[in-house]
Amino acid sequence: MFESFETIRLVVRRMTMGDAQELTAISDVAQVSQWMSFMEGGFPLEKARAMIAAQNETRETFFAVRLRNRALAGALGMVDHPDHSIEIGYWFGLDHQGKGYGYEAVRAYLEQIATDPSLAGRPIIAEAYPDNVASIKLLAKAGFSATSRPGHRPNRIGFALAPRNSVEPKSI
């Protein structure tokens, strides 16, 4: 699996303990944490450290999304489900929302998945709360469509990416 990748404005790499404090700073805000089930009740430093530490023991992987000036803008996540599907997720700090970073990161992430021999060709899914309009718009722009099934977590809409052969990698 890939460790890092870059876009025009972003540097994305596997999350480490060195990211925990900054991750808490951008995530432990109600307007961000309300959309993430694992951040229920907030996202203090202990939760950030536990999430980062667990990624080697679970089928979950997290990536730090940094601007070229090295500021942490957000995070990407991947869950390798037993049914062979890959679930992606993302969140960005308030100061970095609405600037196109989310789409840029997700699009490049999907391109990395499509070219990784261990991941390519597998179904890619995502989910969002019905009232998370920004996330739903981002997923649609990235090529996802709502499915008739709910997400893996309660009260979520399930989304699926168009089949691989209909998604052409493109530069961001």
Range-by-range predicted roles:
Residues 31-52:
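Conserved GNAT-fold acetyl-CoA-binding loop/helix
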Residues 52-64:
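A short helix-loop-beta-strand connector motif used in the catalytic cores of GNAT acetyltransferases and
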Residues 1-34, 62-172:
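Acyl-donor (CoA/ACP) binding surface of acyl/acetyltransferases
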